[in-house]
Amino acid sequence: MDIEKAASRREEEEPIVQRPKLDKGKGKAHVFAPPMNYNRIMDKHKQEKVSAAGWKRGVAIFDFVLRLIAAITAMAAAAKMATTEETLPFFTQFLQFQAEYTDLPTMSSFVIVNSIVGGYLTLSLPFSIVCILRPLAVPPRLFLIICDTAMMGLTMMAASASAAIVYLAHNGNSSSNWLPVCQQFGDFCQGTSGAVVASFIAATLLMFLVILSAFALKRST
Protein backbone atom coordinates (compact mmCIF):
# COMPACT_ATOMS: atom_id res chain seq x y z
CA MET A 1 0.00 0.00 0.00
CA ASP A 2 2.82 2.39 0.85
CA ILE A 3 4.43 1.68 -2.52
CA GLU A 4 1.19 2.40 -4.38
CA LYS A 5 0.71 5.68 -2.48
CA ALA A 6 4.29 6.78 -3.25
CA ALA A 7 3.82 6.00 -6.95
CA SER A 8 0.57 7.96 -7.07
CA ARG A 9 2.23 10.94 -5.39
CA ARG A 10 5.06 10.93 -7.97
CA GLU A 11 2.55 10.92 -10.79
CA GLU A 12 0.76 13.89 -9.25
CA GLU A 13 4.02 15.84 -8.75
CA GLU A 14 5.37 15.27 -12.31
CA PRO A 15 4.35 18.01 -14.80
CA ILE A 16 1.99 17.08 -17.54
CA VAL A 17 3.68 17.38 -20.96
CA GLN A 18 1.51 17.42 -24.03
CA ARG A 19 3.12 15.73 -26.97
CA PRO A 20 2.50 17.26 -30.35
CA LYS A 21 0.39 15.30 -32.72
CA LEU A 22 2.32 14.14 -35.72
CA ASP A 23 0.70 14.21 -39.09
CA LYS A 24 0.74 10.72 -40.50
CA GLY A 25 0.41 11.97 -44.05
CA LYS A 26 3.46 11.37 -46.19
CA GLY A 27 5.00 13.94 -48.54
CA LYS A 28 3.34 16.92 -46.89
CA ALA A 29 5.55 19.99 -46.43
CA HIS A 30 4.73 22.83 -44.10
CA VAL A 31 4.37 26.15 -45.94
CA PHE A 32 5.74 29.10 -44.02
CA ALA A 33 4.05 32.35 -44.86
CA PRO A 34 6.37 35.36 -45.47
CA PRO A 35 6.43 38.07 -42.84
CA MET A 36 3.79 40.72 -42.99
CA ASN A 37 6.27 43.42 -44.11
CA TYR A 38 7.81 41.32 -46.92
CA ASN A 39 5.93 43.12 -49.68
CA ARG A 40 6.81 46.45 -48.13
CA ILE A 41 10.51 45.54 -48.10
CA MET A 42 10.40 44.42 -51.73
CA ASP A 43 8.62 47.60 -52.79
CA LYS A 44 11.21 49.69 -50.98
CA HIS A 45 14.02 47.75 -52.67
CA LYS A 46 12.44 48.31 -56.09
CA GLN A 47 12.08 52.02 -55.40
CA GLU A 48 15.75 52.24 -54.42
CA LYS A 49 16.77 50.48 -57.64
CA VAL A 50 14.61 52.81 -59.71
CA SER A 51 16.04 55.90 -58.01
CA ALA A 52 19.61 54.59 -58.41
CA ALA A 53 18.99 53.89 -62.09
CA GLY A 54 17.62 57.41 -62.50
CA TRP A 55 20.61 59.34 -61.19
CA LYS A 56 23.06 56.91 -62.80
CA ARG A 57 21.39 57.52 -66.14
CA GLY A 58 21.90 61.24 -65.57
CA VAL A 59 25.59 60.61 -64.80
CA ALA A 60 25.88 58.51 -67.98
CA ILE A 61 24.35 61.30 -70.08
CA PHE A 62 26.79 63.82 -68.59
CA ASP A 63 29.59 61.32 -69.28
CA PHE A 64 28.54 61.11 -72.92
CA VAL A 65 28.55 64.90 -73.33
CA LEU A 66 31.97 65.28 -71.68
CA ARG A 67 33.35 62.40 -73.75
CA LEU A 68 32.16 64.01 -76.98
CA ILE A 69 33.68 67.38 -76.04
CA ALA A 70 36.96 65.72 -75.03
CA ALA A 71 37.13 63.86 -78.36
CA ILE A 72 36.61 67.07 -80.32
CA THR A 73 39.19 68.90 -78.19
CA ALA A 74 41.86 66.20 -78.55
CA MET A 75 41.37 66.00 -82.32
CA ALA A 76 41.47 69.79 -82.57
CA ALA A 77 44.75 69.85 -80.63
CA ALA A 78 46.30 67.27 -82.95
CA ALA A 79 45.03 69.03 -86.08
CA LYS A 80 46.20 72.44 -84.88
CA MET A 81 49.69 71.19 -84.11
CA ALA A 82 49.93 69.26 -87.39
CA THR A 83 48.89 72.24 -89.53
CA THR A 84 50.97 74.90 -87.75
CA GLU A 85 53.98 76.06 -89.72
CA GLU A 86 55.65 79.31 -90.65
CA THR A 87 58.26 80.29 -93.21
CA LEU A 88 60.51 83.36 -92.94
CA PRO A 89 62.47 84.69 -95.94
CA PHE A 90 66.14 85.44 -95.29
CA PHE A 91 67.67 87.93 -97.72
CA THR A 92 66.26 86.09 -100.74
CA GLN A 93 63.39 83.72 -101.42
CA PHE A 94 65.86 80.91 -102.08
CA LEU A 95 67.18 80.98 -98.51
CA GLN A 96 64.35 80.61 -96.01
CA PHE A 97 63.79 79.53 -92.44
CA GLN A 98 60.84 77.23 -91.88
CA ALA A 99 59.33 76.03 -88.60
CA GLU A 100 56.92 73.10 -88.39
CA TYR A 101 56.02 70.43 -85.88
CA THR A 102 58.13 67.71 -87.56
CA ASP A 103 61.27 69.62 -86.60
CA LEU A 104 60.78 68.55 -82.98
CA PRO A 105 60.18 64.90 -81.97
CA THR A 106 58.18 66.10 -78.96
CA MET A 107 55.69 67.85 -81.23
CA SER A 108 55.43 64.78 -83.46
CA SER A 109 54.67 62.63 -80.41
CA PHE A 110 52.10 65.22 -79.36
CA VAL A 111 50.23 64.83 -82.65
CA ILE A 112 50.33 61.03 -82.47
CA VAL A 113 49.16 60.84 -78.85
CA ASN A 114 46.30 63.31 -79.26
CA SER A 115 45.18 61.55 -82.43
CA ILE A 116 45.08 58.23 -80.56
CA VAL A 117 43.20 59.78 -77.64
CA GLY A 118 40.70 61.46 -79.96
CA GLY A 119 40.11 58.18 -81.80
CA TYR A 120 39.65 56.29 -78.54
CA LEU A 121 37.16 58.83 -77.20
CA THR A 122 35.18 58.59 -80.42
CA LEU A 123 35.11 54.78 -80.30
CA SER A 124 34.14 54.84 -76.61
CA LEU A 125 30.92 56.74 -77.30
CA PRO A 126 28.92 53.51 -77.93
CA PHE A 127 29.99 52.22 -74.49
CA SER A 128 28.76 55.46 -72.98
CA ILE A 129 25.43 54.95 -74.76
CA VAL A 130 25.23 51.44 -73.26
CA CYS A 131 25.69 53.01 -69.82
CA ILE A 132 22.77 55.33 -70.59
CA LEU A 133 20.51 52.47 -71.67
CA ARG A 134 21.65 50.18 -68.84
CA PRO A 135 22.69 52.49 -66.02
CA LEU A 136 23.14 49.67 -63.50
CA ALA A 137 25.57 47.71 -65.70
CA VAL A 138 29.06 47.53 -64.19
CA PRO A 139 31.31 45.96 -66.93
CA PRO A 140 31.10 48.84 -69.47
CA ARG A 141 31.67 51.41 -66.74
CA LEU A 142 34.69 49.45 -65.47
CA PHE A 143 36.11 49.21 -68.99
CA LEU A 144 35.72 52.95 -69.51
CA ILE A 145 37.38 53.95 -66.24
CA ILE A 146 40.45 51.78 -66.98
CA CYS A 147 40.88 53.11 -70.52
CA ASP A 148 40.11 56.70 -69.53
CA THR A 149 42.80 56.59 -66.85
CA ALA A 150 45.40 55.34 -69.34
CA MET A 151 44.45 57.95 -71.94
CA MET A 152 44.47 60.71 -69.35
CA GLY A 153 48.06 59.81 -68.45
CA LEU A 154 49.14 59.79 -72.11
CA THR A 155 47.48 63.12 -72.82
CA MET A 156 48.95 64.78 -69.75
CA MET A 157 52.41 63.46 -70.61
CA ALA A 158 52.31 64.72 -74.20
CA ALA A 159 50.85 68.09 -73.22
CA SER A 160 53.43 68.63 -70.45
CA ALA A 161 56.38 67.77 -72.69
CA SER A 162 55.11 70.05 -75.46
CA ALA A 163 54.44 72.83 -72.94
CA ALA A 164 58.12 72.72 -71.93
CA ILE A 165 59.18 73.11 -75.57
CA VAL A 166 56.74 75.98 -76.11
CA TYR A 167 58.04 77.69 -72.97
CA LEU A 168 61.60 77.49 -74.28
CA ALA A 169 60.46 78.84 -77.64
CA HIS A 170 58.85 81.83 -75.93
CA ASN A 171 61.47 82.60 -73.27
CA GLY A 172 64.62 80.72 -74.23
CA ASN A 173 67.25 79.62 -71.72
CA SER A 174 70.18 81.90 -70.97
CA SER A 175 72.12 79.13 -69.19
CA SER A 176 72.10 76.97 -72.31
CA ASN A 177 72.34 79.92 -74.71
CA TRP A 178 68.97 79.04 -76.22
CA LEU A 179 67.46 82.13 -77.74
CA PRO A 180 63.68 82.65 -77.89
CA VAL A 181 62.44 82.03 -81.42
CA CYS A 182 58.87 83.25 -80.98
CA GLN A 183 59.97 86.79 -81.79
CA GLN A 184 60.61 85.61 -85.34
CA PHE A 185 58.10 82.75 -85.58
CA GLY A 186 55.17 84.38 -83.82
CA ASP A 187 52.41 82.60 -85.73
CA PHE A 188 54.03 79.21 -85.23
CA CYS A 189 54.35 79.75 -81.48
CA GLN A 190 50.74 80.91 -81.19
CA GLY A 191 49.53 77.82 -83.01
CA THR A 192 51.56 75.43 -80.88
CA SER A 193 50.49 77.21 -77.69
CA GLY A 194 46.83 76.85 -78.66
CA ALA A 195 47.31 73.15 -79.39
CA VAL A 196 48.95 72.58 -76.00
CA VAL A 197 46.13 74.40 -74.20
CA ALA A 198 43.55 72.28 -76.04
CA SER A 199 45.42 69.12 -75.05
CA PHE A 200 45.40 70.16 -71.39
CA ILE A 201 41.65 70.76 -71.64
CA ALA A 202 41.19 67.25 -73.06
CA ALA A 203 43.26 65.81 -70.20
CA THR A 204 41.13 67.69 -67.66
CA LEU A 205 37.93 66.37 -69.23
CA LEU A 206 39.33 62.85 -69.08
CA MET A 207 40.05 63.36 -65.39
CA PHE A 208 36.42 64.35 -64.83
CA LEU A 209 35.31 61.26 -66.75
CA VAL A 210 37.40 59.05 -64.45
CA ILE A 211 35.89 60.73 -61.38
CA LEU A 212 32.35 60.24 -62.71
CA SER A 213 32.95 56.56 -63.46
CA ALA A 214 34.52 55.99 -60.04
CA PHE A 215 31.57 57.68 -58.34
CA ALA A 216 29.06 55.56 -60.28
CA LEU A 217 30.96 52.35 -59.52
CA LYS A 218 31.24 53.19 -55.83
CA ARG A 219 27.50 53.70 -55.49
CA SER A 220 26.93 50.41 -57.35
CA THR A 221 28.70 48.38 -54.66
From Swiss-Prot:
Topology feature Cytoplasmic, residues: 1-58, 131-148, 216-221
Keywords on record: Cell membrane, Cell wall biogenesis/degradation, Glycoprotein, Membrane, Transmembrane, Transmembrane helix
Membrane-related topology note: Multi-pass membrane protein
Domain of life: Eukaryota
Location of the protein in the cell: Cell membrane
Cellular compartments per GO CC: Casparian strip; plasma membrane
Chief site of localization: membrane
Annotated TM spans: 59-79, 110-130, 149-169, 195-215
Any GO BP: cell wall modification
Molecular function terms from GO: protein homodimerization activity
Region annotation Disordered: where it falls in the sequence: 1-28
Side Extracellular, residues: 80-109, 170-194
Ranges of compositional bias, category Basic and acidic residues: 1-12
Residues carrying a glycan: N173
Function of the molecule: Regulates membrane-cell wall junctions and localized cell wall deposition. Required for establishment of the Casparian strip membrane domain (CSD) and the subsequent formation of Casparian strips, a cell wall modification of the root endodermis that determines an apoplastic barrier between the intraorganismal apoplasm and the extraorganismal apoplasm and prevents lateral diffusion.
Family per similarity comment: Belongs to the Casparian strip membrane proteins (CASP) family.
Subunit structure: Homodimer and heterodimers.
Name of the molecule in the record: Casparian strip membrane protein 3
Record organism: Arabidopsis lyrata subsp. lyrata (Lyre-leaved rock-cress)
